[in-house]
């Protein structure tokens, strides 16, 4: 039986937490579906009791869009002073602190023993490539093949060309273990084309769909599409769901 190398927790939309051997990573948190019920709150991935004593907590925000960033993340320092923040340079904060690291496309940084490289996006901000505890993790942010039906043919071609150029650049990474990638239902019948292209070209060991809001049904459809390409894609049903890698 394969040893579990990471546990992935779906928070909401493009927000995920990943528990590796020695680290706890959070990507693109903007809200978490919980009620005021105390028992329910304790099921929350980011309930204070769950992370207050954790060491090596790294919080990533790929850009300043309201569905990828919430300044609430800085409140977590009140109950865990070990948190490190890795933020796209388009994110503005009131006061910089020693535990804030800002990064832009093509930059590479080591934050303690975690390697981070910023790749580009087809929207604002960046995508993240993270190497930690022997794993290589990619979070796309808003990098996607944004094929909107209402766009002109010329605009659609620009979107395709830009997207494929970013994926070509990412191919310099020879092996990605876990990748998080958008499957946005607003794109209608074209929701899957970016994820399918990404999967075929990059070949991650595990492909985790994101950026679908409340439309969890779309992850099942996407997983079925990816089966035809021999890429393992995850079906997500509910917030707080645990995925083992």
What are these regions (language model features)?
Residues 2-3, 82-135, 230-245:
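Metallo-beta-lactamase
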Residues 9-11, 24, 99-108, 191-245:
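Binuclear metal-ion centers of metallo-dependent hydrolases, dominated by the metallo-beta-lactamase
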Residues 26-28, 55-67, 85-89, 138-141, ...:
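Active-site neighborhood of phospho(di)ester-bond hydrolases with catalytic His/Asp-centered motifs
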Residues 17-60, 71-76, 143-172:
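Pre-active-site segment of Zn-dependent metallo-hydrolases
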Residues 7-10, 25-28, 115-120, 136-142, ...:
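Active-site-proximal beta-strand elements of phosphoester/diester hydrolases
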Residues 46-108:
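Active-site HxH/HxHxD metal-binding segment of metal-dependent hydrolases
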Residues 13-14, 33-34, 64-69, 91-95, ...:
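Active-site environment of divalent metal-dependent phosphoester hydrolases
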Residues 122-200:
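Active-site-proximal loop/helix segments of hydrolase catalytic cores
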